[in-house]
Amino acid sequence: MKDSVIIVSGGMDSITLLYDKKDEIALGISFNYGSNHNEREIPFAKMHCERLGIKHITIDLGFMHQYFKSSLLEGADAIPVGHYADDNMKSTVVPFRNGIMLSIAIGIAESNNLKKVLIANHGGDHTIYPDCRPEFIKAIDEAAEAGTFVDVRVVAPYTNITKGEIAAIGKKLGIDYAETWSCYKGGEKHCGKCGTCVERKEALAEAGIEDTTEYEE
């Protein structure tokens, strides 16, 4: 039964969840909030939704670029290099980004009489992103249920697994991860050095997947 909305960025995790739950998904939603890499990743989200016959929409959140503070919104040169778990990667946090996106998706779900909102946060996000942590997901799920007539639920099945484990799921599903985008710098190729590029490399290696991503280095 197609009773779900998915927040789909075009990255490895959300594309895996898209294929993993494709039989349940009625609508894919991407958000353009003015980050360096939105223009690189959203086309992949749209492409995969179209491939699966799932309606896709992109919602503009340009106000976040104007009013929010994050290196992710300041241009490629502002993105730190290093491992995803390093403290310097905290500069890439867009404050309450998932909370805002989930709130909109919950409203869209209720407006379309859909019961669930899917999001692909994972265990590796917990160190850096407060709105990816289990306690946040639990709280917003309870708020969604309490705040909607149709008892919309937030479902985040990857919350306590690693990106490598997500890649292993994708491997079983036959996903070509070359058709996803990770790099926060948003250049013509993945930079190969920022936290998301490093994490991408590690996840693919952990899952035993040949990495055909084009990296600058």
Model regions and ranges:
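Glycine-rich nucleotide phosphate-binding loop and flanking beta-alpha elements
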Residues: 125, 204-205
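Local cysteine-cluster metal-coordination motifs and their immediate loop/turn environment
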Residues: 103, 179-202
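Short cysteine/histidine-rich metal-coordination sites, predominantly Zn2+-binding motifs
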Residues: 186-187, 207-217
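Short amphipathic alpha-helical interaction/hinge segments
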Residues: 148, 205-208
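ATP-dependent adenylation/nucleotidyltransferase module used to activate substrates
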Residues: 1-174
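Residue-level recognition of conserved structural "scaffold" positions that shape functional pockets
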Residues: 17-18, 199, 215
